[in-house]
Amino acid sequence: MIKLIAPVETYSVRRKVLRKNMPDEPHQFHGDFDPETFHLGYFLNNEIVGILTVIKNGKIAQLRGMAVLEEHQGKNIGRKLVEKVEKMLSEEHFTKIWMNARETAVPFYEKLGYSIEGEIFVIKPIGFHYVMTKYFD
């Protein structure tokens, strides 16, 4: 089941997946509590196993902090989260969604119809990223 969650509910998955090699890294992201930001959680047996955050800016949205616990990867949870967000944004007549995708996640997003825009860049200390976008009709 996918539902809206509070920012603090994303922290455990962020820590385990997105910040696992950075024990002192804060799990709160800039903008987590902004009124134009929302968070989704994917629940299995009342446990959050997948998360993502969306920041709205006009009719453009940024997806960030997308993560699925390792033991639940490969079960289409990430795809379902992204598709849910796309449906929500499409119904609100958004024109574009974008993200800074880790280099290793590019094939996942390409399968969902996202395209690379621009050159590879580094977000320290995370690693190599690409801006990826998808336009809504």
Q: What does each model-found stretch correspond to?
A:
Residues 98-100, 115-131:
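Conserved catalytic-core motifs of GNAT/GCN5-like acyltransferases
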Residues 82, 89-102:
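Conserved GNAT acetyl-CoA-binding A-motif
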Residues 41, 47-55, 62-67:
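Conserved beta-strand in the GNAT
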Residues 1-12:
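A short beta-loop-alpha structural element at the N-terminal edge
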Residues 68, 74-87:
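Conserved acetyl-CoA-binding loop-helix of GNAT-fold acetyltransferases
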Residues 14, 109, 114:
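Conserved active-site tyrosine of GNAT-family acetyltransferases
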Residues 56-66, 73, 123-129:
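A conserved beta-turn-beta hairpin within the catalytic core of GNAT-like acetyltransferases
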Residues 14-45:
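Active-site rim helix/loop that mediates acceptor-substrate recognition in acyltransferases
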